[in-house]
Amino acid sequence: MIQVRKRDGKVVPFDLEKIKTAILKDLKAIGHEGDLEATASKYADEVFALCEQKYLPKTSIFDIENIQDTVVQVLAREGELRAVIAYCEYRYQHKLEREQRVKKVYEDKLMAKHVVNQNANIDEYSGGGRSGEAANVYEKQYALDHCMSEKARRNHENNEVYIHDLNKYAIGFHNCLSIPFDDLLSKGFHTRQGDVRPAGSLNTAFQLVAVIFQLQSLDQFGGVSATHLDWTMVPYFRKSFMKHYIEAWMKDQQEYESSDCLALYDQTYTDALGVTRSAYEKWTDGAKEKFFEKTGLTKDDFKLANKGKLNKRYYNSALADTIQELHQAVEAMYHNLNTLQSRSGDQLPFTSVNYGTCTEEEGRLVTRALLLGSLEGIGFHHNTPIFPCGIFQYMKGVNDKPGTPNYDLKQLAMRSTSQRLYPNYANVDWSGNAGYDRNDPRTYFSTMGCRTANGYDINGLGQLKDGRGNICPTTIIMPTLAMEADRDVEKFMKLLDEKIHEAKDTLIERFNWICSQDPKTAPFMWDNNTMAGYIPEEGIRSAMKHGTLALGQLGLAETLQLLIGCNQTTPEGMKLAKRIEELFSKRCKEFKEQYKLNFGVYYTPAENLCYTAMKKFKAKYGVIKNVSDRDYFTNSIHVPVWENMTPFEKIDIESQLTGYSSAGCITYVELPSTTKHNVDALEQIIDYAMDKDIPYFAINVPNDTCMDCGYTDEINDACPVCGSHNIRRLRRVTGYLTTDYHNFNLGKQAEVKDRVKHIKSFAKKEQTA
């Protein structure tokens, strides 16, 4: 069947009568004589014949612009020059009308009309949000018109292969990055306006983490993460500990009693570099030199493990001061990352921190402080912080069971999860991260909060995570393909294979576009080598090639329902699901070898796409029971949120599919707010997920806070303490949290309401041999 692609991307059946009507209207407008009906029919037939000749061998879908060009060609060939002029004027008028419609959309965004909340972290009513959303209207259109192939545009507009963050395409930004904090904190970094010296204390290091997160987020469109923050902070804990130890020693010296600190601070001197400093600094520097001379200690001695070598009183004093500094530094970081609105729309950087594997006492204290900071909350009412996304790295022999060095930290992590939803759990021993170096935490499995992960780098960096990230994602909207394949399994598999190849081409197009950018477009990133492997002489491709190209998917459950009448919760559905995922995995492995780029299977979060894709699907195919009778598609390979089952059953189902993903996935279970009183049951679930080789796992529990008195629990209509209806209802949107689920788009709100708690049983599932 021949079809027509309209300018808005919609595909409709070809209708020769419409061409005839347009030509007839044109002939009447110029006062053409004779049998106008017959003439218009003749010209319309010629247009169709010429379109068949020019386009049908390549495609059965004619673009409306090509059809109209052919009308002009036929009229000119027939000598109807006045008709050509009139028809061109007609096209021009319609172009102006289309531009007016775009202008109307722009104005609506600018004035915050018809807000849809595409991203729950953006305030579309704010000045920055209105400006950003309005600009996006033209930036998206420019990308579609000028930055990609016709095939990529067609797939995007036809609801088949979605191109994410289209508004950032033209400027050449990439998606996300795991930041090499070890290097940036130890060496310092440059910004456009100045530079920053290496961190000399815990407090400074944690402040700089927030600053670096913010700076890097402005050079990309996605999330930023720290892959092993507990290990990263060990040297800065020791620096602070040494400083506090020396201060304790100084206060015990006789000359300290006779010193006049105020007078010293008032005095200045010029050092060898010409820098003006206070005399107090010179005095303390001199005291430090005396300290090392008199005690015989070196900087390397200041480790908590060296307690026997250090003075007990100074040790205890320094440790108390350092722990206090650590607590305040972590508290400040949490508040900074929840208030540094550095993107348009009062948007916070999407930050994640991975931790939990460092067994050095300093690193253990850092992990403990991060977890206590999560439990304590932020602000007047100790609200649950939505950033950073905390991710506890679950590692066998380190923190998985009683008797391991960091098991106590796992217990604290579970307390935090049961109350604050964070941390999530990254499976360091996941089979997909095989070959990591247990002596190098930079290779441990880590992830972004949403689920993006770095697999094995084919271009030489192996399992290294720091300095790598996702370059760009696409998502295949599988329910559309199922309908286009007439709900036939074999036709669908053939079409899916075709679209996987086309999605690959789309990713390569965007990758090349990104690599064509001047390093000046992201000065912080390239001046400070935050992306690994950057060689200035070779351009930014030298670094980008180490990132991932994510080939995502949406709506497996609905696709199976269309094809065979059931989803992956049934044996028949799971069999076809595995066949589909095997195809994704096989092709990505082939592409990775063929192009020497890190293609990976991605189980898309689809925060906004779940809603927009469904709207387009309904508009074309109508309401289909168990497929489009809701306002959203199910994310990737997830079990539909309305399916009633135990957490163990959900893990059993999704664990059969998560192994196919190499670019990121997540598994959730929904639990009641009473989970905080049953942490033992929570541990059974987490351990079961890790044993089932789930790479990234999260727990959803209700988290409602009264904004008048601060009471936090699952709250119905009114606060049980003060009766207030001013309730913040925090829920998870992808892997991240958001301030209130009413900030989600309508589709995501509907999904939240449909979520059932997996509480059929908390009894531990017996393992079968």
How would you label these PLM feature ranges?
Residues M1-H114, A750-V756:
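Charged, amphipathic alpha-helical regulatory modules used
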Residues Q93-E97, K103-K545, C566, T570-R731, ...:
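Conserved catalytic cores of very large enzyme subunits
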Residues D717-A769:
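Long insertion/accessory domains within large nucleic-acid-processing enzymes
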Residues D15, I19, C472, L549-L556, ...:
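Catalytic-loop motifs flanking and including active-site residues across diverse enzymes
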Residues L549-L562, E582, R732:
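Contiguous, well-ordered alpha-helical segments that form the cores/surfaces of helical PPI scaffolds
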Residues K6-V11, A29-A38, L461-K465, R541-H546, ...:
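A ubiquitous short alpha-helical element
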Residues E46-C51, L75, L576-E590, E751-K764:
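Short, mixed-charge aromatic SLiMs
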